């Protein structure tokens, strides 16, 4: 961990930041922004923009990228940091940047200060690192977009975390005070303490365990689940008070996997206390026992809470039913409890009215469509597997039904003879036959010239038999003709020459290619006028 090099900010002029903002605006719909577009957005002459971009490239605030078709400039993460710090300095929110105090798969954390030298915490979101690139699976920043740049996703993550910080702070949760946000930078209060994973001793482990479990339940009652509630995202102060950090993965309790995330948070706390403090409690919260008290997930549009679900929930709230957010099983249980109580008969009627609504009002249309597609795919795979098993069973039954005796009775059928155990190569068969004949003659002499007819027949069959296999193993490989090899080598040389010819050289390579194309067009239509 080190310091962020912000010394160049004091030497940058207004035109430098003007060009940086122009590149940022051009990257909304361009992967690389051409020089002409940067000049048009910045409102500066192309020559002045080119000189300014050269200065910015020297300090790695922008990067020039060349390709086969397009050349242009791209904003780097350092340039994005400078733009965020410049805006916050102009608002008089940030006055200095200090050492780095934390690093993660999604962000970097630095110590900072305001113009009055009060300590602040600066969190720079860094989405797109190689250690965490499955953003579309793990986070909902994309929503329905097919693609987006890492800088834009970092900006969305910062805005989402700032919104969660403000909402949790207003409801009395122990979180750092949110100060301001700009692009991918979140400014918050600096919390002086140590993470729970580094704590070695507490006065009362049971009381701390109860406070953490109560905090999980309190968040669930307000409609959200932390999703990553572990010892690395909890800071303990000197008086053993707990402060929560890191909220980009918070989900709604109406998320399809809400119970899994809730149980995972509870399991993380129980496992940590058993391992660290040798404390294990028999009581822990259950997801089915949570009763909603607020709708913070609706206000913040947490993951898993769709607009249609929000409309249905608001409609139920207007009718006076505060249990419409629960799942179907929880509704059935509460209906039974309400049915037993005669005084709550009106509430049970309202619950039945809500249950009679169609399912498409309770679930998102996209989720239902996805479920139908998965069911169809499973049916297709199942039909293919059953078809194969049926064919295999029919084939085995047919093989078992074959009558070998009937085949033997047919003409042309001969017994299949296996090679003997001491079978050798055909090249050595003549020598072996001579040795066998000598041995057989000796045996005949020993037996006084009396040889059985069966032995003579076996001897004739052995000599006439053709070996059905060989002991040696030969490897086979595909061979190429000389003409084929020459043709392939010539093709490789041609491709290498084309690669060298297409190699981009110089900053104005795209301009040169366009001019060459224009010359060809002019030469083609020469003399027409």
From Swiss-Prot:
UniProt catalytic activity: L-seryl-[protein] + ATP = O-phospho-L-seryl-[protein] + ADP + H(+); L-threonyl-[protein] + ATP = O-phospho-L-threonyl-[protein] + ADP + H(+)
Superkingdom assignment: Eukaryota
Q: A single Gene Ontology molecular function, please?
A: protein serine kinase activity
Q: Which residues form the active site?
A: 228
* Tissues expressing this chain: Expressed in pharynx (metacorpus and posterior bulbus). Expression is restricted to adult stage.
Q: Keyword Magnesium: yes or no?
A: yes
Q: Pfam families given for it? A: RIO1 (PF01163), Rio2_N (PF09202)
Renumbered to this chain, the Acidic residues biased-composition regions fall at 337-346, 429-447
What residue ranges are annotated as transmembrane? none
Question: Record's GO cellular component, any one?
Answer: preribosome, small subunit precursor
Q: Which UniProt keywords apply?
A: ATP-binding, Kinase, Magnesium, Metal-binding, Nucleotide-binding, Serine/threonine-protein kinase, Transferase
Q: Which cofactor does it need?
A: Mg(2+)
Annotated Basic and acidic residues bias: 411-428
**Domain Protein kinase, first and last residues per copy:** 97-273
Which family is this sequence assigned to?
Belongs to the protein kinase superfamily. RIO-type Ser/Thr kinase family.
The free-text function statement in the UniProt record for this protein reads:
Required for larval development.
Q: Write the protein's name.
A: Serine/threonine-protein kinase RIO2
The protein's organism comes out as Caenorhabditis elegans
Query: Gene encoding this polypeptide?
Result: riok-2
């Amino acid at each position: 961990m080190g310091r962020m090099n912000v010394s160049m900010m004091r030497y940058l002029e207004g035109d430098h930041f003007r060009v940086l903002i122009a590149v940022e605006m051009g990257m909304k719909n361009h992967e690389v922004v051409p020089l002409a577009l940067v000049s048009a957005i910045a409102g500066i002459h192309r020559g002045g923009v080119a000189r300014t971009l050269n200065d910015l490239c020297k300090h790695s605030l922008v990067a020039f990228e060349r390709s086969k078709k397009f050349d242009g400039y791209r904003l780097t993460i350092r340039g994005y940091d400078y733009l965020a710090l410049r805006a916050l300095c102009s608002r008089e929110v940030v006055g200095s940047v200090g050492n780095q105090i934390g690093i993660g798969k999604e962000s970097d954390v630095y110590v900072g200060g305001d113009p009055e030298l009060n300590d602040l915490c600066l969190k720079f979101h860094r989405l797109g690192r190689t250690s965490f690139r499955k953003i579309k699976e793990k986070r909902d920043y994309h929503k329905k977009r097919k693609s987006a740049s890492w800088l834009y996703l970092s900006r969305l993550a910062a805005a989402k975390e700032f919104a969660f910080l403000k909402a949790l702070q207003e409801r009395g949760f122990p979180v750092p005070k949110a100060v301001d946000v700009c692009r991918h930078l979140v400014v918050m209060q600096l919390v002086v303490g140590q993470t729970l994973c580094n704590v070695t001793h507490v006065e009362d482990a049971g009381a701390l365990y109860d406070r953490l479990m109560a905090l999980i339940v309190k968040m669930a009652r307000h409609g959200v689940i932390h999703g990553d509630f572990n010892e690395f995202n909890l800071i303990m102060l000197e008086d053993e008070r707990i402060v929560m950090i890191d909220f980009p993965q918070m989900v709604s309790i109406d998320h399809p996997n809400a119970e899994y995330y809730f149980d995972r948070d509870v399991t993380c706390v129980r496992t940590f206390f058993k391992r660290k403090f040798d404390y294990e409690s028999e009581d822990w919260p259950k997801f089915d026992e949570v009763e909603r008290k607020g709708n913070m997930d609706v206000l913040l549009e947490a993951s898993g809470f769709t607009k249609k679900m929000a409309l249905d929930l608001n409609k139920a709230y207007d009718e006076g039913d505060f249990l419409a957010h629960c799942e179907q099983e929880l509704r059935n249980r509460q209906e039974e409890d309400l049915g037993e109580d005669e005084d709550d008969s009106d509430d049970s009627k309202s619950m039945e009215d809500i249950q009679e609504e169609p399912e498409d009002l309770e679930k998102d249309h996209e989720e239902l469509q996805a479920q139908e597609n998965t069911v169809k795919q499973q049916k297709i795979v199942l039909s293919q597997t059953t078809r194969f098993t049926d064919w295999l069973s029919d084939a085995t039954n047919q093989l078992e039904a074959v009558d070998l005796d009937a085949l033997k009775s047919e003409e042309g059928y001969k017994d299949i003879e296996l090679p003997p155990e001491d079978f050798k190569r055909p090249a050595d068969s003549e020598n072996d036959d001579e040795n066998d004949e000598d041995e057989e003659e000796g045996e005949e002499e020993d037996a006084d010239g009396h040889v059985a007819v069966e032995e003579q027949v076996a001897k004739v069959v052995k000599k006439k038999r053709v070996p059905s296999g060989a002991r040696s193993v030969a490897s086979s490989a595909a061979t190429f003709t000389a003409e084929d090899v020459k043709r392939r080598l010539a093709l490789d040389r041609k491709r290498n020459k084309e690669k060298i010819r297409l190699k981009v050289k110089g900053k104005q390579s795209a301009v040169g290619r366009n001019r060459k194309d224009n010359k060809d067009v002019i030469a083609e239509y020469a003399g027409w006028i």
